[in-house]
């Protein structure tokens, strides 16, 4: 017997004996089979993917046409509809040159708004190379907010941007507000407002961000070697443990730690270079750096190879 569980409102069929096994789908028979024990845990399975057919009169010609889009469970009717493609023969047009067969697709205004938002979310995610699971979670968040009508008066693009920010936090791959701003047309201030309103409306939360959440990506974008990244991570963690940076954002602390580590190595980076990657101003980096500089000897890992001694580091 198949057991089902809900993940983000989407059903998942699992084997009762091997719940972690990835089921094998037999499309010909319409069965879902457990590869571990061979149990058929689902039958008469319907393929909800998009369907392609070939309508060419010439069998040697390949012109597959989509005759059905994939099902979208986030829309009210699953977005199951029939689309008529453009004709190519003379019989497809009337005497005025207009297509005889045209789409008469009915879609509610709410579904149309969600479809537009989903497209915008996918576009934003593609621009910063976010995986599909982030897009799916963002779409689910947007649907919940939209149906609750709790953010009436806010632009859908702003809500979508805030949902993307929340989804990244919840999936453990946080992005900064400025990174989301860069791929959307929404200001940081508006995304921040929607972010707080969404958390309140959905009664959900996100994990607190730490300096470690950004360190690897920032250092990679700055083309810094592994030794500098490890040193910057150590510096930031020790600075927090020693309570040297109270009230400072993890992003500014991470940027200051990277600046200190790079200045002590042969791979030096300027405040502007780091600020451009981290999305913080030079003055913000300097303020955090000044807080940790007096304890610099205590912040570096013991095995760090200095190119510039601690006492020669910039004092700013």
From Swiss-Prot:
Entry-linked SUPFAM superfamilies: Cyclin-like, Zinc beta-ribbon
Phenotype for residue 189 to L: Reduces interaction with VP16
Pfam assignment, any one: TFIIB
Positions that bind Zn(2+): 15, 18, 34, 37
Region (Necessary for TATA box-bound TBP complex formation): 244-316
PTM note: Acetylated. Autoacetylated; autoacetylation at Lys-238 stimulates transcription activation.
GO cellular component labels: cell division site; chromosome; germinal vesicle; kinetochore; nuclear body; nucleoplasm; nucleus; protein-DNA complex
Keyword annotations from UniProtKB, A to Z: Acetylation, Acyltransferase, Chromosome, DNA-binding, Host-virus interaction, Metal-binding, Nucleus, Phosphoprotein, Repeat, Transcription, Transcription regulation, Transferase, Zinc, Zinc-finger
UniProt effect for mutating residue 238 to A: Abolishes autoacetylation, represses transcription activity, does not inhibit its association with chromatin to promoter-specific regions and decreases the association of GTF2F1 with chromatin to promoter-specific regions
Tissue: Expressed in the inner cell mass forming the embryoblast. Not detected in cells from the outer thin layer trophoblast (at protein level).
GO BP, one annotated term: DNA-templated transcription initiation
Intrachain S-S bonds: none
GO-annotated molecular function: acetyltransferase activity; DNA-binding transcription factor binding; histone acetyltransferase activity; nuclear thyroid hormone receptor binding; promoter-specific chromatin binding; RNA polymerase II complex binding; RNA polymerase II core promoter sequence-specific DNA binding; RNA polymerase II general transcription initiation factor activity
Record PROSITE patterns: TFIIB, ZF_TFIIB
Coiled-coil ranges from the UniProt annotation: none
Chief location: nucleus
ZnF bounds (TFIIB-type): 11-42
Enzyme category, top tier: transferase
Signal peptide region: none
N6-acetyllysine modifications at: 238
Region described as Core promoter DNA-binding: 189-193, 249-252, 283-286
Binding site for DNA: 53, 61, 152, 154, 189, 196, 248, 272, 281, 284, 286, 290
Catalytic activity: L-lysyl-[protein] + acetyl-CoA = N(6)-acetyl-L-lysyl-[protein] + CoA + H(+)
Function: General transcription factor that plays a role in transcription initiation by RNA polymerase II (Pol II). Involved in the pre-initiation complex (PIC) formation and Pol II recruitment at promoter DNA. Together with the TATA box-bound TBP forms the core initiation complex and provides a bridge between TBP and the Pol II-TFIIF complex. Released from the PIC early following the onset of transcription during the initiation and elongation transition and reassociates with TBP during the next transcription cycle. Associates with chromatin to core promoter-specific regions.
Domain free text: The TFIIB-type zinc-binding domain is necessary for the interaction and recruitment of RNA polymerase II to the core promoter, the formation of a fully competent pre-initiation complex (PIC) assembly and basal transcription initiation. The C-terminus is necessary and sufficient for interaction with the TATA box-bound TBP complex and for the formation of PIC.
Protein name: Transcription initiation factor IIB
Source species of the chain: Homo sapiens (Human)
